[in-house]
């Protein structure tokens, strides 16, 4: 799978595909993840650090070189 990293200082990880959904965690600048699926403006990610899964705005993710 392709690896992605967070390109902003901090971004919420949400339980559902919505800005109004509960924030269950955060992804910090430079932390890496895999994209499991994409829906609209959001991507469901799995964090490399701890395996945590949730939804983030796709615009904060950049593909690793």
Predicted regions and their residues:
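Boundary regions of SH3-family modules and the immediately adjacent low-complexity/disordered segments
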Residues: 1-10, 17-18, 22-34, 39-65
């Amino acid at each position: 799978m392709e690896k992605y990293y967070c390109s902003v200082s901090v971004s919420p990880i949400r339980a559902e595909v919505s800005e109004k959904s509960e924030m269950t965690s955060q992804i910090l600048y430079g932390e890496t993840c895999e994209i499991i699926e994409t829906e609209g403006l959001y991507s469901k990610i799995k964090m490399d650090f701890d395996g945590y899964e949730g939804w983030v705005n796709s615009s904060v993710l950049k593909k690793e070189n």
